[in-house]
Amino acid sequence: MTAQGLYYLIRTLVALVAIPFHEAGHALAAWLLGDDTAKREGRLSLNPLKHFDLLGTLCMVFAGVGWAKPVSTDPRNFKNPKWGMALTALAGPVANLLLAYLAMVAWKLLYYWAPVTEGTVLVARFLQYLVYMDVGLAVFNLIPVPPLDGSRILLAVLPQRIYFGVMKYERVILIIVLAAVWGGFLDGPLSVLNDLVWNLLDLGTFYIDRIAYATYYASLGAVI
């Protein structure tokens, strides 16, 4: 397999993990807050087939921005519909950030203590791409424009008249945002935000670096 083919294979596998985690996060939050609509539709699952959208997944793999089937919610089932929708929306990016943190922990453990083999190099590359994609999904979805998760979070703080006035143009706004992303117009701001989140995750797993350095210097002392 060529290097480019391997790259896209790993990105495909990463997408099949990151996207279901995001959507299952929405479904879990909705269920915990009193709405079982997504659970009844089978969306409380990490099975990629439950969330799979062919075009959205292909766009994620090849263009870096994509989508899955939207998770259905019924605001009437929430005790507080406004905050129920906002917290359910927030749960998707939070799920991605949690997965990114766990992937970075695993990646560092592999980097410091696993023997260097062809297999461990592939796993390390998978974990690294998983962190990148999860961070990218979280950051992109928090953009406060419809129909991204950030717009649902705005519902909790904006007057309903303004919010629903904006939502009338949801499809047009989405096309503009996707065109801006694919055209590279948002590369700068998104890169800055992605790097910021990556650095925070790196800082949050710094204890692994310290343990690795301490172990290394202790082994030097034992040899001496």
Feature-to-residue mapping (PLM):
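Hydrophobic transmembrane alpha-helices and their immediate loop junctions
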Residues: 1-224
